[in-house]
Amino acid sequence: MTTETAEKVEYIIETKDVDLFYGSKQALQKIALNIKKNQVTALIGPSGCGKSTFLRTLNRMNDLIPNVKTTGEIHIGGENVQDPKIDMVNLRKKVGMVFQQANPFPFSIYDNVAYGPRMHGIKDKKVLDEIVERSLRQAALWEEVHDRLDRSAIGMSGGQQQRLCIARVLAVKPDVILMDEPTSALDPISTAKVEDLILELKKDYTIVIVTHNMQQASRISDETAFFLNGRIVEFADTTSIFTNPAEKETEDYISGRFG
């Protein structure tokens, strides 16, 4: 009996038979994926395969797109994400998201990080100061910006802006952080900083990352799901996926035969 089996695996995200349609076009087919707590799970696959669409089902961002229909079961922390009565503000607090392009608000660095806590009712300046410092430290940004918190976030470098967006997510203490190609617009040095940050953050958070960069997936993830044509072809520990894939389609993609 493995240690993992003996200790019983804790899944924070559980999905079953998830289908998604954009109008009449089916984008996801019977997706069943259980994601472990405090791990990094990578979603890989060619463009248009459904990986970003699936990521957005986890905090219902697809609801913002006209004519989208999602069916199946999605539970996060035991809560039914598909429940029509769910508190969407609370869901997106619990399940934060970092996008491909850094999207800082046109505010000061301080106000970017304090925005979420203020939205959730925190007004005390001392408490906000503590949250801002903690979040910027967690995002490995405090030492770079602590003496210019009142300056506009728009003047930061691209890599700093992306880490600021991560700090903004951390400020509301999510359980899960979704990342959609978070380093694709960054230079190699900034990418390395974000990757180091992801590895540090998984001690306290569960991270699901969409990436086209297979080397990145192999460096930072514990498990990897390979998507193709709206379905999951293979889901396994990352080492197995990249060194001994069970499916020929996975092997063909990993080896660069298509995609």
UniProtKB/Swiss-Prot annotation:
It is an enzyme of class 7 (translocase). SMART domains: AAA. It is found in: Cell membrane. It holds the Pfam family ABC_tran. Its EC number is 7.3.2.1. The keyword Endoplasmic reticulum does not apply. Keywords: ATP-binding, Cell membrane, Membrane, Nucleotide-binding, Phosphate transport, Translocase, Transport. It comes from the Bacteria. GO terms for cellular component: plasma membrane. Part of the ABC transporter complex PstSACB involved in phosphate import. Responsible for energy coupling to the transport system. This is Phosphate import ATP-binding protein PstB 1. It comes from Listeria monocytogenes serovar 1/2a (strain ATCC BAA-679 / EGD-e). The lineage of its organism: Bacteria, Bacillati, Bacillota, Bacilli, Bacillales.
